[in-house]
Amino acid sequence: DRPYETAKADGIRCVSTLAALADTKPDVLVLCNPLKAMPQILGALKPLIDTDITTLTDVGSVKAMVREQVKAVGLEHCYVGAHPMAGNELSGWESSDPTLYDGALWAITVDENTEYQRFRAVATMIVDHCSNRLIVLDDATHDRCAALISHMPHVISTAMINELVANPNRNIAAALAAGSWRDMTRVALTD
């Protein structure tokens, strides 16, 4: 309840169910949930949203998988993939940073079935309403590039932490750690 109370205090309108959200008939609905929850959320949204009105997008870091999940529930005609290239190792409402997306680059992913007005709705949200920048890609190109510059650093960072924890001299190594260690392992703190 605390994140909702804080959000409400900050002037953000909160709803407690997907049905209540769908009742607001948003122009653009941005899914900001963990990727593993996507199939369940998409399945629950399908009978609730008016796809003639609402364009569906998400901020997931993997686009091809999400598009397949969107297709599996029959929402592909109203979907445009999006991935803001901004973030940090923190999570939760209390960790939010109002400047995190300032000037951020968003990858918008489309395919041959993406409707132009859907693309335009998401692009307008990103550029006009959020003052951000965008690049348009196909899902596969996005996923390969995101793996290289975002996912691989997470894997390497986690491997470094695991190596330290398993090392019998971990306390000495931790005492010697400085800026390079901090910078290389920061993203391992994500959940």
Model-identified regions with their sequence ranges:
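Rossmann-like NAD(P)(H) cofactor-binding subdomain of soluble oxidoreductases
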Residues: 41-94
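Glycine-rich, N-terminal phosphate-binding loop of Rossmann-like dinucleotide-binding domains
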Residues: 32-34, 60, 110
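Short, structured coil segments at secondary-structure junctions
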Residues: 10-11, 75, 129-130
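Rossmann-like NAD(P)-binding element
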Residues: 17-51, 55
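Internal alpha-helical scaffold of NAD(P)-dependent oxidoreductase catalytic cores
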Residues: 100-190
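NAD(P)-binding Rossmann-fold cofactor-contacting core
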Residues: 1-10
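Short acidic-hydrophobic, aromatic-tinged amphipathic segments that line or gate anion-handling sites
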Residues: 13-19, 135-137
